[in-house]
Amino acid sequence: MMRLLAIFISLFLFFPLSAQKKEISQARSDIKNRNNLENAESSMRELLKDSANKENIKIYITLADAIKTQYEIINEKFYLNEPADTAMFFNTLRKMFIAYESLDSIDMQPDKKGRVKLKHRKKNAEYLSRYRINLYNGGIYFVKKNNFNSAYDLMDSYIRCKIQPLFSSCM
């Protein structure tokens, strides 16, 4: 009887992990194919709502990559002079910065021996520092549109970059 109970418990513990891996895999596939990016983002955000996943760096990486790809698609449209939503461009940029800051905070967590190994910081900081000025430009854009809440959010993100540990090597 105890053996049967142990089997059931292990099965119930295994199925959520399997579903989580499947969602991450599907999201990565969507990112690679550059489609269903909003679904990939929302599924990663749903996984992060579960307290068991708060420390899973793979989810944060996938979330950041989904938002990064959304931003790059809109950015490509601007460079190709195709119609694109400017407000969405700047809001996606802000979401991207927030996602990478969250990823960095998880990356900074010490391991079991108390050591901190920053695997992603340098690459992410270099990538984001190229687009930091667009936070400022987005703030100006929203001021001109009289959307002061969004302008404040973007300007605040621009200024906070100076104190974010993620950007300590770039500034």
Model-predicted regions and their roles:
Residues K54, A66-K145, D153, R160-C170:
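Short coil/linker segments at helix-helix boundaries
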Residues D30, N36, S43-L47, Y60, ...:
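Alpha-helical solenoid repeat scaffolds, predominantly canonical TPR units
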Residues M1-S29:
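Bacterial Sec-dependent N-terminal signal peptides
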Residues Q20-M88:
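Start-of-domain marker
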